[in-house]
């Protein structure tokens, strides 16, 4: 019984570390101006949900298109920082992440909060819902 509990605890901490690493990889991709690489953490599916100041967007490509429109160049993109406030396992298949985002830009800094829902799809953790404000 102790082995099973230890194995489960190890698996959970490993999954949490994977989630944290994926978010860090997003930050690094953004900071090099690579929106496509930034989007690799998102579920490449028409059911991806992104909620922002303009409302709800469904779909990976539409979300990428919105990022390209809203952040057309590296000056608009700036340098991204995240402050993860909570990374919580909801089940074997889901993680919930709450944090702050901040863009340091020559055209003026911006920032806000986000919630992410990660789901394990085909043995890979992906963001299936993002609410950023």
Predicted regions span which residues?
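Structural motif
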Residues: 44, 90-91, 121
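Short, low-complexity N-terminal intrinsically disordered segments enriched in polar/charged residues
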Residues: 4-41
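A short gly/proline-enriched turn/hairpin at secondary-structure junctions
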Residues: 45-58, 72-75
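A mature extracytoplasmic/lumenal domain signature
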Residues: 54, 86, 99-101, 116, ...
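Surface-exposed, charged secondary-structure patches
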Residues: 64-107
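Short beta-strand edge/turn micro-motifs at domain boundaries
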Residues: 111-133
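Hydrophobic pocket/interface hotspot
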Residues: 26, 38-39, 47-48, 63, ...
């Amino acid at each position: 019984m102790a082995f099973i509990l230890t194995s489960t605890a190890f698996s959970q901490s490993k999954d949490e570390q994977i989630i944290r690493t994926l978010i860090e990889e997003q930050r690094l991709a953004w900071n090099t101006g690579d929106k496509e690489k930034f989007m690799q953490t998102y579920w490449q599916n028409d059911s991806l949900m992104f909620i922002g100041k303009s409302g709800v967007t469904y779909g990976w490509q539409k979300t990428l298109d919105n990022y390209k429109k809203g952040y057309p160049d590296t000056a608009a993109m700036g340098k991204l920082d995240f402050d993860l406030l909570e990374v919580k396992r909801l089940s074997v298949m889901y993680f919930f992440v709450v944090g702050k985002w901040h863009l340091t830009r020559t055209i003026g800094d911006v920032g806000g909060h986000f919630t992410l829902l990660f789901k394990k799809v085909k043995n890979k953790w992906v963001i299936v819902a993002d609410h950023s404000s």
